[in-house]
Amino acid sequence: MKLKKNIFTIGATVLLLSLLSACSSSNNSSNSTDTAGNETTAKTHLVTDALGHKVEIPNQPKRIIGSYLEDYLIALGEKPVAQWTVGSGSIQHYLQKELKDVPTISYDLPYEKVLSYEPDLLLISSSATVEGGKYEQYSKIAPTYVVKNGNDVTWETQLKDIGKALNKEKAAEKIITDYQKKVKATRQELADKINGKTAAVLWVTNNSAFMVSETRSSGRIIYGDLKFGVPNLVTEISKSATSDWSAVSAEKLAELDADYLILVNSDEKAAMFNEATWQNLKAVKENHVLEFGPESSWLYNGPIASQNMVNDIKNNLK
């Protein structure tokens, strides 16, 4: 009986150890599965874009197309696989140090061309780009994220949104903070040149003049950030503006009484520069014209463009 009892005890012990071992193996297997699942999940993150699409984006995308968002991508340390162009090869010249080897893609993002670049992420700068079923087409190629856009959306808002999409929100915040510090320092350094002075930004192309709106594009930099005064003509034109730049007739241009004129000159031989209307402008007569070419950043938006514009003002007025 004693022998049988010992055998029973040993058998029970072996059975218990076997059960514990099985449970342990099961737990390890479960843990391994969970870990593998977590690792898989960690490779992507889910975000909601400007149009309400829930988009699963790689944490570290390698082949991004962000047409007309290259400024933001470069600022965040990303190099796209293709860059924006329009018309007969117009590109963002001020970004070419970083994009010189990057091929171009038309602003309207032709499907076959997009497909040929094998992107792993598409960032869309305008809701209109994906109308008419195009979003569904693009999303078959790669995760497609429509960035916040519209006339009232600032570059800071767009940068934060792109930062969210790229899992680089802290980097986006730092860029904005650094820009604000630069603006503050520039205002202080140029206080005697800015305080009480007005300025206007004028783009001349094809012998025609266009004025930037008070709250858009470079207008935000000049008036909102650097705090130059707003000339009456700029205020008037801004009220009816439907885009960043509004056409200005020669008759209206004659009313411009800005202390400083920031000229974005895309037509150096424009006849208007020799006309009385131009020669009689206050800023022209006082030699307060700051001239920049079309390859500068003054026609664009974004963190790099904005920093460049602040630097341009600082370097020309200090």
Predicted regions and their residues:
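Bacterial Sec-exported substrate-binding components of ABC uptake systems
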Residues: 2-12, 22-68, 171-202, 265-269, ...
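Short helix-initiation/N-cap motifs at beta->coil->alpha
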Residues: 49-51, 102-112, 240-250
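Structured C-terminal subdomain patch of bacterial secreted/periplasmic proteins
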Residues: 256-318
